[in-house]
Design a protein with these regions (language model features):
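Extended alpha-helical scaffold/tether regions of large eukaryotic proteins
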Residues: 1-439
Length: 439
């Protein structure tokens, strides 16, 4: 039989391992762990009390380390939520789009795009949302023009993915306009607002010249557009063509002009298209605005009428340029095949056209968490209604329900979202632009 001393030596590593194991267990959930183990600090056996004190000391010493562990656990949970959110045949994501209140459109659009971009599936989301928006639009005049999460998604997508494109197209135009002499930088056409010393006929020519500069730059840029832009335009065109064939190009124009180029022309400083601290004169701002009105009418394939009679003098210019704009909308809606390069040794390299994957940041997780938490009941009801509308067979319906139940459990594990100040919904700048300027 081993002596008492040798037994202590033998058990010492086991004792230390037990203390370490308990330290790790308690640190993983301090609140629950201490609730059941705190009484060990008052145990009759002094060795138990000593062991507990060592456990408590380890927890305090390793606090920072386990905070990192807790963050990792939360990130893992968020990633599982994102996987299910992006998966499940887009049903959860599309349900959120259906039930999202106006006050959540901004955050929901940002959260949706962040999630799908992190899995390289942004275009899958946009194509599904575009098709659904077209199906739910009762009038071709409203196609991609009403305030909805679909139009907001397109605007956020354009802003995130088109910064370099819009800069390369429009920045040279703004530079040239700024270099023109003062007499070529007056654009008012409304005779009741024309300043002293200004001539309406000269202003009309200035408007035509400036608008032509913007139009030529835009209409010659189809091949510069990001491939993802052209895929979105192609999806809009094909989706609209099935239901409103006469409106397919104007629908593409609603995206590429109303939600992309026109807001940048009206507010070039917000897109970094002019030098910092550059002051744009009132006359030049008016010129930018009138140019966008002309371009938008071209995109809509309509002439000016009784609503703004002073703009009717530009109808000949519109008539002469409608074909140019329509041709541009057709070109940008064509998705080119991947480029190929033949190497000297005969091997062929095909262009990688896979979408860019952008990892989510903590602010993206927080935004997604809040939007889902606030809308979970609505999403649940919509998911249940979808099962009924789709007339699923019992086996598929059960799998559908099981998947959403798993998603709900993951959300329950996340608990309440972090407290953040929810921004007031101000609407999209291009919505405001469109409403204010009757485009």
């Amino acid at each position: 039989m081993k002596s008492k001393g040798s037994m202590s030596t033998y058990l010492a590593p086991l004792k230390e391992s037990t203390i370490l194991a308990m330290s790790n267990l308690l640190s993983a959930n301090v609140d629950a762990g201490l609730k059941y183990s705190l009484s060990m600090g008052y145990h009759d056996d002094p060795q138990m009390r000593t062991a507990f004190m060592k456990v408590l000391t380890n927890i305090l010493n390793q606090g920072t380390e386990f905070e990192t562990l807790a963050e990792t656990v939360m990130t893992d949970r968020y990633e599982k939520v994102v996987d299910m959110f992006v998966g499940m045949d887009l049903n959860i994501a599309l349900s959120l789009c259906d039930v999202c209140p106006a006050s959540d459109i901004e955050d929901a659009a940002n959260a949706l795009l962040a999630c799908f971009a992190s899995r390289g599936k942004t275009l899958d989301l946009l194509k599904a949302v575009i098709r659904k928006e077209v199906e739910n639009t009762d009038s071709e005049t409203e196609l991609l023009r009403r305030t909805s999460i679909a139009t907001r998604l397109l605007s956020v997508f354009a802003r995130h993915n088109g910064a370099d494109y819009v800069r390369s197209v429009l920045q040279p135009v703004f530079t040239k306009l700024a270099e023109k002499p003062p007499e070529e930088r007056t654009f008012e056409l409304d005779s009741s607002k024309v300043g002293s010393g200004e001539d309406v006929s000269r202003n009309k020519q200035n408007v035509i010249n400036a608008t032509e500069m913007f139009l030529n730059a835009i209409c010659e840029s189809a091949n510069e557009a990001p491939r993802s832009f052209r895929e979105v335009c192609h999806c809009i065109l094909t989706s609209v063509r099935e239901r409103y064939p006469e409106a397919m190009y104007t629908a593409v124009g609603a995206f590429i002009f109303l939600r992309f180029f026109c807001p940048a022309i009206v507010s070039p400083e917000s897109e970094g298209l002019i030098k910092i601290n550059t002051v744009i004169s009132r006359e030049m701002k008016r010129g930018h605005l009138i140019a966008t009105k002309v371009i938008q009418n071209l995109a809509n394939n309509v002439l000016f009428g009784a609503k703004e009679t002073y703009m009717i003098v530009l109808n000949d210019f519109l008539t002469n340029n409608i074909y140019k704009v329509t041709n541009f909308l057709r070109e940008i809606s064509e998705v080119p095949p991947p480029a190929t390069t033949v190497l000297p040794d005969g091997r062929t390299i095909v262009e990688d056209v896979r979408p860019e994957v952008r990892p989510m940041e903590q602010k993206d997780y927080n935004c997604l968490h809040r939007v889902l938490f606030d809308n979970m009941e609505r999403i649940s009801r919509e998911i249940a209604a979808r099962r009924i509308r789709q007339h699923l067979d019992p086996e598929r319906a059960a799998a559908y329900k099981q998947g959403f139940d798993k998603f709900s459990n993951l959300m329950a594990q996340l608990g309440r979202p972090p407290e953040t100040t929810k921004p007031e919904f101000n609407g999209l700048r291009s919505y405001t632009f469109a409403a204010a300027n009757q485009l």
